[in-house]
């Protein structure tokens, strides 16, 4: 994982995605996305070249995507959920099928992500993968003389009040692996298994300083000395903390780690489809990919594009083309009973 964000000379790449044509008629894009995916460093060149103005609203959990679209989908043109949620939006009829022949760099994307059931279904494409990584754990180096290797550290009573967990149902997954072994299929847990997971997470609650919702919130918890250890969006928050000279260490637990991939989707009946398609092409172009990776420290979906801006050491550090690493992660997919998982997680948070 990255200890600091990459410095990438985007200007040397040029406006490859949208800069080869004249600026189109102006349009607007309202997007619902994660922090880091609409940084001005790469959004402004897109806006200048395309004539499309982008406005972002940020989420802290995948559960926000269906909730916000179901109650006001017309407010957004594009969304970027993880691939365990893209299929939910498809089933709800909230997103458009895409013509991959109009996506210039589609065939350069990793096949594992192009063919993921959250991206392609029934011979149609419903998402454009942009970035991927792990749900790692991270800790303040000076607080742990002995480096932790297991997720069980998150239940260590000596760390009471110094632990933070992501406010997301995926906390169920790592807890299930601890209880039932790392080979358990965490997306099809039985009622009995989910009850045991709930009990384990409720037992953890007195140790939790706060369930974090956004990258910025977690960074502030560390910067203020309120927490010493948490789970994390691998590479991103640790890089933000490194910029404040706070030395963090990331690790993948011996119980195995979640893998995630995020994909942009076009909202059903968007009136701004032309600008939306320009953005979808841009985010998987050399400039878009290098911009996203440079800001977030995540791995990119288009390794061909990234070879133009990453050194060989950076490319290796991000596990680009490291299929052994990719396959070692438990890549998210939609739980068989997603509503039940959300119910369990909400019950954990509500427990006294």
Residue ranges and their predicted role:
Residues 80-86, 90-219, 223:
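Extracytoplasmic ligand-binding site segments that recognize negatively charged/polar headgroups
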Residues 262, 267-326:
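Mature extracytoplasmic/periplasmic domains
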Residues 76-81, 211, 228-233, 249-250:
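Paired acidic/hydrophobic, glycine-rich loop segments that form the ligand-binding mouth/hinge
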Residues 85-88, 229-247:
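A ligand-binding cleft/hinge motif common to bilobed small-molecule-binding domains
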Residues 194-204, 244-268:
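Periplasmic-binding protein-like
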Residues 26-88:
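Early extracytoplasmic/lumenal segment of secretory-pathway proteins
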Residues 324-352:
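Conserved C-terminal helix/tail region of periplasmic/extracytoplasmic solute-binding proteins
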Residues 90-97, 121-125, 240-252, 314:
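Ligand-binding "clamshell"
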């Amino acid at each position: 994982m990255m200890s600091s964000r990459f410095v990438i000379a985007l200007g040397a790449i040029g406006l490859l995605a949208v800069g080869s044509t004249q600026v189109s008629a102006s349009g607007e894009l309202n997007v619902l996305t994660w922090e880091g995916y609409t940084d001005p460093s790469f959004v402004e060149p897109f806006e200048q070249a395309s004539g499309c103005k982008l406005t972002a609203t940020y989420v802290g959990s995948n559960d926000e995507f269906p909730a916000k679209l179901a109650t006001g989908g017309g407010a957004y043109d594009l969304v970027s959920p993880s691939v365990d949620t893209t299929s939910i939006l498809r089933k709800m009829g909230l997103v458009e099928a895409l013509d991959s022949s109009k996506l210039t760099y589609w065939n350069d994307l990793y096949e594992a992500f192009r063919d993921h059931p959250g991206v392609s279904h029934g011979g149609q494409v419903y998402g454009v993968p942009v970035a991927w990584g792990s749900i790692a754990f991270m800790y303040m180096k000076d607080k742990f003389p002995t480096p932790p290797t297991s997720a069980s550290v998150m239940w260590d009573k000596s760390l009471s009040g110094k632990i933070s967990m992501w406010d997301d149902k995926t906390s169920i997954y790592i807890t299930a692996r601890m209880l039932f072994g790392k080979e358990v299929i965490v997306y099809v847990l039985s009622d009995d298994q989910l009850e045991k997971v709930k009990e384990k997470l409720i037992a953890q609650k007195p140790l939790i300083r706060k369930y974090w919702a956004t990258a910025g919130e977690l960074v502030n918890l560390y910067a203020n000395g309120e927490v010493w250890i948490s789970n994390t969006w691998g590479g991103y928050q640790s890089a933000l903390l490194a910029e404040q000279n706070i030395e963090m260490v990331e690790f993948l637990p011996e119980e195995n780690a979640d893998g995630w991939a995020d994909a942009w989707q076009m909202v059903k009946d968007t009136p701004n489809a032309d600008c939306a398609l320009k953005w979808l092409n841009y985010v998987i172009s050399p400039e878009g990919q290098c911009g996203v990776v440079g800001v977030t420290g995540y791995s990119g979906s288009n390794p061909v594009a990234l070879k133009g801006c990453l050194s060989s050491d950076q490319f290796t550090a991000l596990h680009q083309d490291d299929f052994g690493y990719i396959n070692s992660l438990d890549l998210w997919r939609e739980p068989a009973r997603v509503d039940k998982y959300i119910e369990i997680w909400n019950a954990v948070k509500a427990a006294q």
